[in-house]
Regions:
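PRPP-associated nucleotide enzymes
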Residues: 1-267, 273
Length: 273
């Protein structure tokens, strides 16, 4: 029995619904087209059961908008019912191309604006959905994952806030520090997808003269935070690894951080056979 046949023995949680926010509209449409084609081509013995009603549709996208008032404030609106749905909300908090008018001035949307729009749509759902999953490719405030002085832990607060609003699962990609899921250890599911395979695949497909050997290629981490990923890639490909680290001046603080004192320093770590 194939995996697809075996998985269909499990009843759907609810009718599938995709809500791509304005920041993730294009990606949401691609996902929708893939799901429509995939489900249309699948055949299984339970497709006529009542539990699978609405399994095949022309589109799974549910229209939702976040219009703004002249003051710059906004509200979330869903154009159709989502009662009993298995909803997937998609948001790209790093999409700076979107703008809105504030007191006659044009403002670009910041990650804070996108996150607030996400919460507005969750609030508009009003707890009527069967399950809510948030897909956020770049985890909101993921760089603020630890406290090194008197500062806020924004990423942990955001995760706790989403769970408190009824979010069941949070899916992100290559989180800055996956240990931030300690903020919600017992509530909700937190998944961070590592893109190492897609990274290697993309390089191999787009660089025709690539030579993956220690004489022509090495893996370099741009800072200390990326060493884990660099170690994994260099180990898999059998390449040498290098890294840069910042030599900071800890006697001064400029714009809230210690400035780089001299320059970036490079280290090379050869592979062992």
């Amino acid at each position: 029995m194939s995996n697809s046949e075996r998985n269909l023995e499990t009843l759907p949680t609810g009718s599938l619904g995709i809500i791509p926010l304005q920041s993730c509209q294009e990606l949401g449409e691609k996902v929708d087209k893939y799901l429509v084609k995939w489900r249309d081509e699948r055949q299984h013995q339970h497709q006529n059961d009542a539990a699978f009603m609405g399994y095949k549709r022309d589109s799974y996208i549910i229209e939702a908008v976040t219009p703004r008032f002249g003051s710059g404030e906004a509200k979330g609106m869903i154009k159709e019912t989502v009662r009993g749905y298995d909803l997937y909300l998609m948001v790209d908090v790093t999409n700076y191309s979107l703008t809105y008018s504030l007191c006659g001035q044009t403002n670009h949307m910041s990650p804070d604006d996108h996150y607030q729009d996400l919460k507005r749509i969750i609030a508009a759902i009003g707890g009527k959905a069967r399950r809510i999953t948030v897909i956020i490719p770049f985890l909101y405030e993921s760089r603020q994952h630890r406290r090194s002085t008197r500062e806020s832990l924004d990423c942990a607060l955001a995760l706790q806030e989403l769970v408190a609003m009824g979010v069941d699962n949070i899916i992100t990609f290559d989180a800055h520090d996956p240990r931030v899921q300690n903020a919600i250890p017992l509530k909700g599911g937190f998944e961070t997808v590592q893109p190492a395979y897609q990274f290697i695949k993309g390089i191999c497909k787009n660089v025709p003269d690539l030579q993956i050997d220690s004489d022509h290629m090495m893996i370099i981490s741009p800072d200390e935070g990326g060493t884990g990923r660099a170690i994994y890639l260099s180990s898999v490909l059998g390449l040498d690894m290098g890294m840069f680290y910042k030599r900071r001046d800890y006697s001064r603080i400029v714009d809230g951080r210690n400035p780089i004192a001299v320059s970036y320093t490079h280290l090379t770590l050869p592979t062992t056979s």
